[in-house]
A protein has these predicted regions:
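A conserved helix-loop-strand patch within extracytoplasmic ligand-binding domains
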Residues: 110-115, 122-123
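Glycine-rich active-site/cofactor-binding loop and its immediate structural neighborhood
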Residues: 126
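Structural scaffold elements adjacent to functional motifs in cytosolic proteins
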Residues: 130-132
């Protein structure tokens, strides 16, 4: 699929970062010069990023990261025919994925990683408890068959779910999964510190599974939400059918878009009664500016850019 012009790369690594300000500066300079967009999160505990650029600059980025001593990145690539990000953002935070649990040593405590090829066997065992670690809005559009939805609004709520629902299951086989694997790293490490004995996690996350396992053998049902302008992907990493409501930032289905409550860029069935008249008017004005920008060939962050815009 590398004949598609844009590479989308997601990666993370838990490692102690020194000179974090300098690392941010070097990455910002490199990505800006090479027209790479997306988000990089840096923290004392490591790096977490989803970026996109033309194929060659992303190859150069991988070499740059090695030069910066990120030798053991957990990374995943996919390819697209348009730029899925609007801008470059590099942030320094307390954690590379927010869990609000200080002093958690992920390298020491993370669960056993299970490859895509072995995942179906594990989750189809009667004694396995299968848990989706993602947030509720992500689970709603797709998940693994027979998985448990913890109904969390954010990742840090997962700890409460454990205490309320799995506190008596510390000796059971618990298999967990998330989009790319990073949330499972923290969740499984936390569970190990709480006495859970048999914690397994899907290596590379859902995205790796969707790429590795053919549709006819897949236990995945629905689509997988991704945090970029693709919105969702399906089995074998094919483009999904969901769009993003730019009013509430929730994924919306084809049926949602047929609803009387749906107006592109302004409202959907999930938010039509939650936004004010002023908010809706502002969204209408934004839509108008997008159309003007399209006609004049001007930059607008809500327009999907193609390789010709990067030449």
């Amino acid at each position: 699929m590398k004949n598609l012009n844009f590479t989308i790369i997601t990666f993370y690594q838990f490692k102690k970062i020194e000179n974090i300000i300098n690392i941010k500066k070097l990455l910002k300079e490199f990505c800006s010069f090479n027209k790479i967009k997306g988000t990089i999160i840096l923290a004392d505990e490591g790096i977490n990023a989803t970026l996109s650029g033309l194929n060659e600059p992303i190859d150069l980025l991988e070499k740059k990261l090695i030069n910066l001593k990120f030798f053991n990145l957990e990374k995943k690539k996919s390819f697209n025919n348009y730029m899925p990000f609007n801008r470059l953002k590099i942030k320094i935070k307390k954690e590379i994925v927010t869990f609000n649990e200080e002093g958690l040593d992920v390298d020491k405590w993370s669960g056993k990683h299970i490859n895509s090829s072995d995942w179906n066997d594990l989750i189809n065992k009667k004694e396995t408890i299968l848990v989706d670690v993602r947030n509720n809005f992500e689970v709603q559009i797709g998940t693994f068959k027979n998985s448990i939805n913890p109904n969390t609004k954010n990742f840090s709520e997962f700890k409460n779910y454990l205490k309320e629902n799995l506190i008596t299951k510390k000796n059971n086989n618990i298999a967990m999964f998330c989009t790319g694997g990073i949330r499972c790293e923290k969740a499984s490490a936390y569970m190990a510190t709480q006495g859970y004995k048999n914690v397994f996690q899907l290596k590379g996350g859902i995205l790796q599974y969707l790429e590795d396992i053919s549709k006819d053998k897949s236990e995945w049902k629905g689509e997988c939400f991704v945090f970029d302008n693709r919105v969702s992907v399906r089995n074998e990493m094919k483009s999904g059918t969901y769009e993003l409501c730019h009013a509430c930032r929730n994924p919306i289905s084809l049926n949602d878009m047929k609803s009387k409550c749906y107006e592109k860029g302004i409202s959907c069935p999930k938010c039509i009664n939650k936004t004010t008249k002023i908010k809706k008017q502002n969204l209408k004005e934004r839509n108008k500016q997008i159309e003007i920008a399209k006609k004049k060939g001007l930059y607008n962050p809500y327009i999907k850019y193609t390789p010709s815009d990067f030449s």
